[in-house]
Amino acid sequence: MPLDIYQIALSPLDEDRFDIPSARASGVTIERVPEMIAFCREHGVTFLIARSRATDLNAAQAMERQGFLLMDTLVYWTRSLRESAIPPDTNDVPVRLMRSADGEQVIAVAVESFRDYFGHYHADERLERTRCDAVYTS
């Protein structure tokens, strides 16, 4: 969901993960907060992941006034390929598509990589810790 365009939708994936009626919204602005809340009420949503631009303090504060809590912030890095080219591939690390036989090893890497990770799911005290951990390894 891009942050430039307002979108809201039910989130069956999060509902399955946590057994809570869930939705996701992106591109949230102060003007869209009432519409977003109406959507949640209409659909019985009690767990909403809402994203707004970090520079849009008005949107964040409007959500806080409605009882929302800030769980995390995200930073996206970009690189202009016009200003500097991608470095040449030195073939030091082989890259290939994952095979079905790799499944257990990939899960093991994910489990180790996200051990003690604290994401926005973990920041919500209503959510069971083991289910939060499973989000990053499933």
Regions found by a protein language model. Give the residues of each.
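STAS-typified acidic loop motif
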Residues: D4-E31
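Conserved GNAT-fold acetyl-CoA-binding loop/helix
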Residues: F118-T137
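Short hydrophobic/aromatic beta-strand element in the GNAT-like acyltransferase core
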Residues: A60, T137-S138
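Short, flexible segments with low predicted structural confidence
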Residues: S11-P12, V33-E35, W77, V111-D116
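A structural signal for well-ordered alpha-helical scaffolds and beta->alpha junctions
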Residues: V33, L70, G103, I107, ...
